[in-house]
Amino acid sequence: MNKRKPVVALVGPTSVGKTATAIELALTFGGEVVSADSRYLYRGMDIGTDKPTLEERRGVPHHLIDILDPRDDYSLALFQRDAQRAIEEIHARGRLPIVAGGTPLYLRALLEGWRIPPAPPNPELRAQLELRARREGPEALHRELQTVDPVAAARIPPENVRRVIRALEIFLTTGRRMTELEGREAPPWRVLWLGLTMPRDELYRRIDERVDRQVARGLVEEVQRLLEQGVPPDAPAMTALGYRQIVAFLTGQLSLEEAIQRIKYDTHRYARHQLTWLRRMKQVEWYDVTQPGWYEQLRERVERSLREESDEGDVAVHQSGGGKEAPRA
């Protein structure tokens, strides 16, 4: 009988410190990181995504980072395929996959065995919906989605225009809701869900400080460079938080100060949405990163889970001696 192999899923809102924690766990337990952050996929989008540098990765292999041109489209089904392949390859090397990210839809589709609705893209309809989003605003499309598929609307925030459009596209093409077409099958892995959190005021402070750092590091120049390289301002990658607001500044729709404040406000809202989604997942074990000893408790939880697997003859626990101190967020 084949037992399911282990996967650690590290979740939480933006700015809570998932990336640094995933790297520390990987160093401790012989792991590799699989990114479940939709923004990390794109090359040349480093500052606005707060993507870890090679130095910050500390030699830990990372997967699904810098695999796309910003002009490329990407779907949930493609992410699921690519991430599954990465996990299988990591297991084949006898190492521990650590899936880390804040895109709830990606995490759940991958680790809960979702079957993606079999509705082919409709480019003409999609173009019409994209035009409406630009003219009427993403909230208008989200209200329409609430009318035809309230379950999908509850789990897709208005800011995720691509997913809102895809859900509407599925309904308008097939006459059925996305949530009716979705299915699930048991994932082939044993997933340990670990969540990082902190008081909301502290989280907002971290978000605001990060945005200020990004602007100081050259966020405006990064967006300008992408536009000069021919990336359309309405490309899927450019709808990411931080990028669309700076595009609005560069095209004269907002002042720089207004754009910065909009980034902070929209990121606060996105963090709330992430937490709302993740709090519904009863399998997640939460750790408050502002509490003393939180990382040691989390490390011990992973060690205990892997030891239970090892006792059953599935995997070995590889510890390098890392994880003695809490990682920096």
UniProtKB/Swiss-Prot annotation:
One GO term of the biological process aspect: tRNA modification
Reported cofactor(s): Mg(2+)
Name by which UniProt lists this protein: tRNA dimethylallyltransferase
Organism per entry: Thermomicrobium roseum (strain ATCC 27502 / DSM 5159 / P-2)
Assembly and oligomerization: Monomer.
Region annotation Interaction with substrate tRNA: where it falls in the sequence: 37-40
Binding site for substrate: 14-19
Substrates-to-products reaction catalysed: adenosine(37) in tRNA + dimethylallyl diphosphate = N(6)-dimethylallyladenosine(37) in tRNA + diphosphate
Residues carrying the site annotation Interaction with substrate tRNA: 103, 126
Record key words, sorted: ATP-binding, Magnesium, Nucleotide-binding, Plasmid, Transferase, tRNA processing
Any one GO molecular-function label of the UniProt entry: tRNA dimethylallyltransferase activity
Compositional bias of kind Gly residues: 320-329
Family: Belongs to the IPP transferase family.
EC number: 2.5.1.75
